Amino acid sequence: MASTNDLKNGLVLDLDGQLWTVVEFQHVKPGKGPAFVRTKLKHVLSGKTVDKTFNAGIKVDTATVDKRDMQYLYKDGDDFVFMDSSDYEQFHVGPQIVGDAANFMLENTEVIVALHEGNPLYVELPTSVVLEITYTEPGLQGDRSSAGTKAATVETGYQIQVPLFLEIGTKVKVDTRSGDYLGRVN
């Protein structure tokens, strides 16, 4: 149990048996009437977001979430297999839980897996990863880094926009939150 005054981003709440993550929160003290807390919550399993308002100071149920360092090993059918870095226990995680993180994971990628009562909830990636371009149209002579972008496919199969001068085999840094090209890696 926690008070609504203790809400912060990333906190997992248990509301009516469903797990929700606090994405945004704002304490509001109007001139008239009692204070309240306005929140934006994201459903842990479905990813759906809702706006919910709580009266200030009331108690809400929090869920115990254990975040563990894990390593992505391989894909087994539709499932992704992760290994706990501390005790080498392996977890099979479904594609609905991995979500968009699959676009940036290569074998042996270090990630954080959030567990609730031993069940995986979601996968957190580092903010950026280095991936190799496996396909892109050839650049034209005279292409400059500021001349525009073109589509490129990286080794995970994900497609990003890169500057025109980049070629197949180039390693690039990609932001895992937005999927944007951040720079070339030597």
UniProtKB/Swiss-Prot annotation:
PROSITE patterns registered for this protein in UniProt: EFP
- Protein name from the UniProt record: Elongation factor P
Q: What is the lineage of its organism?
A: Bacteria, Bacillati, Actinomycetota, Actinomycetes, Micrococcales
Look up keyword Cytoplasm and say if it applies: yes
Keywords of this entry: Cytoplasm, Elongation factor, Protein biosynthesis
GO CC annotation terms, alphabetical? cytoplasm
Spell out the molecular function terms from Gene Ontology. Answer: translation elongation factor activity
Q: Which InterPro entries match?
A: Elong-fact-P_C, NA-bd_OB-fold, Rib_uL2_dom2, Transl_elong_fac_P/YeiP, Transl_elong_KOW-like, Transl_elong_P/YeiP_cen, Transl_elong_P/YeiP_CS, Transl_elongation_fac_P
Sorted alphabetically, which HAMAP family does this protein's record hold?
EF_P (MF_00141)
Fetch the PANTHER family from UniProt: ELONGATION FACTOR P, ELONGATION FACTOR P (EF-P) FAMILY PROTEIN
Family that this chain belongs to: Belongs to the elongation factor P family.
Record's function text? Involved in peptide bond synthesis. Stimulates efficient translation and peptide-bond synthesis on native or reconstituted 70S ribosomes in vitro. Probably functions indirectly by altering the affinity of the ribosome for aminoacyl-tRNA, thus increasing their reactivity as acceptors for peptidyl transferase.
Q: Which SMART domains match?
A: EFP (SM01185), Elong-fact-P_C (SM00841)
Q: Which processes are annotated in GO (biological process)?
A: peptide biosynthetic process
| Species this protein is from | Beutenbergia cavernae (strain ATCC BAA-8 / DSM 12333 / CCUG 43141 / JCM 11478 / NBRC 16432 / NCIMB 13614 / HKI 0122)
One Pfam match: Elong-fact-P_C
What pathway or pathways are given for this protein in its record? Protein biosynthesis; polypeptide chain elongation
Top-level taxon of origin: Bacteria
Q: Does the keyword Protein biosynthesis apply?
A: yes
